[in-house]
A protein has these predicted regions:
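Catalytic-core elements of nucleic-acid end-processing and repair enzymes
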Residues: 1-137
């Protein structure tokens, strides 16, 4: 009985995570840039990202914070190939700012990536966030 209860909780959590990812999918960015920003779709994606980039996004409660909408995780990718982990961003929707931005092994991304994140994606995401919040009000 406990296994069934745990499975129901896990499924409910995954459903909540997916609903949050869907709600904020408008903050994804794929315009005229070498880079794209995509939102994490599942806790499993966070684990994969953390393992491949050798940092802590797959552990330490980031999935819980995401499900509670405290912070959102976006993956910064190069357009080609878009599925290879590159840089991970933790974004606060309430404060509209980037909390963390790390490449492999918690290293600081290069200037081109930082410029994309701070000067291109962040203003874009904040503008889109206002639209999401207005439509929810």
């Amino acid at each position: 009985a406990k296994a069934i209860q745990n499975e129901k909780k896990r499924k409910a959590f995954y459903d909540t995570f997916a609903a949050v990812a869907n709600k904020y999918s408008g903050l994804e960015y794929d315009n005229k840039s070498v880079y794209i920003a995509v939102i994490a779709q599942s806790p499993a994606e966070l684990i994969r990202e953390g393992e491949l980039l050798d940092h802590c996004v797959g552990r330490m409660g980031y999935d819980q914070k995401f499900a509670r909408e405290e912070s959102l995780i976006f993956f910064i990718r190069t357009k080609e190939p878009p599925d290879v982990p590159f840089v991970t961003v933790e974004y606060s929707p309430s404060r509209r700012k980037i909390l963390q931005c790390y490449a492999y092994h918690d290293s600081t991304p290069d200037d081109g990536v930082l410029q994309f994140v701070n000067l291109t994606w962040l203003p874009y995401a904040n503008k889109k966030l206002r639209k999401i919040q207005r439509s929810a009000a």
